[in-house]
């Protein structure tokens, strides 16, 4: 059996196209797929390389950490805290001064020993507050120069408070001297009163003696009169 050349060529071509490839496709389609797959693989590899490069670049970036509070901010907060403590102390000292002024005026008018003891107890409480303020200043001396300046200002104010305390102590001493003078006057008055009582007693005794003497004189006069009367009657 013979084949025509045209038919034979077409059959061979068809046969060539229909060769079954081991992966289930024909050869030409498989080659195109392989080319496309290779291109896709190359693209994927390039993408992977780019991703790896990006990852490496990201890994080279510094790690973001929480920045700690700066020393200036720490100083600022500490300074605010010290100012708050100082303002609170000044408010308390002003209130204490107002109370002391009222108490002092009252007790200067009343001149009472009990009031003086009360005044002295208030003064001692104010001294305790000033000592507490000094202790707070000593605790804050390790801060910056601004705090040192604040401490210097506070120390100057504290010195003023101490001067005021000295003046108050002088007033207290004067008040004590005044009380001692009053006590001395009271003792002198009591002594003079005792002297007056003793003088009055002596006057009473003298009066009784005078009365007694007068009584004796009257008796003698009466007796003399009787004797003279009897003598005349005998004659």
Swiss-Prot record:
Q: Which UniProt keywords apply?
A: Coiled coil
Biased composition range(s): Low complexity:
30-60, 140-161
Q: Coiled-coil intervals in this record?
A: 174-213
Region Disordered: which residues?
A: 20-64, 140-164
Q: How is this protein named in the record?
A: Putative uncharacterized protein DDB_G0289009
Mind giving the lineage of the organism this protein is from? Eukaryota, Amoebozoa, Evosea, Eumycetozoa, Dictyostelia
């Amino acid at each position: 059996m013979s084949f025509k050349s045209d038919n034979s060529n077409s059959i061979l071509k068809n046969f060539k196209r229909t060769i079954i490839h081991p992966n289930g496709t024909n050869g030409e389609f498989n080659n195109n797929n392989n080319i496309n797959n290779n291109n896709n693989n190359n693209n994927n590899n390039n993408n992977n390389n780019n991703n790896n490069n990006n990852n490496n670049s990201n890994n080279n970036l510094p790690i973001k950490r929480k920045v700690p509070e700066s020393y200036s901010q720490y100083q600022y907060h500490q300074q605010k805290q010290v100012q708050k403590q100082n303002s609170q102390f000044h408010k308390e000292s002003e209130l204490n001064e107002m109370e002391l002024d009222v108490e002092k005026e009252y007790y200067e008018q009343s001149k009472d020993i009990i009031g003086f003891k009360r005044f002295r107890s208030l003064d001692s409480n104010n001294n305790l507050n000033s000592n507490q303020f000094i202790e707070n200043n000593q605790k804050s001396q390790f801060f910056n120069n601004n705090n040192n300046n604040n401490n210097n200002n506070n120390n100057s104010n504290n010195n003023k408070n101490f001067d005021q305390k000295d003046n108050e102590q002088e007033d207290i001493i004067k008040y004590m001297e005044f009380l001692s003078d009053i006590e001395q006057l009271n003792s002198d008055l009591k002594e003079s009163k005792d002297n007056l009582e003793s003088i009055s007693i002596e006057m009473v005794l003298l009066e009784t003696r005078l009365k007694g003497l007068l009584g004796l004189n009257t008796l003698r006069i009466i007796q003399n009169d009787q004797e003279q009367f009897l003598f005349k009657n005998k004659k």
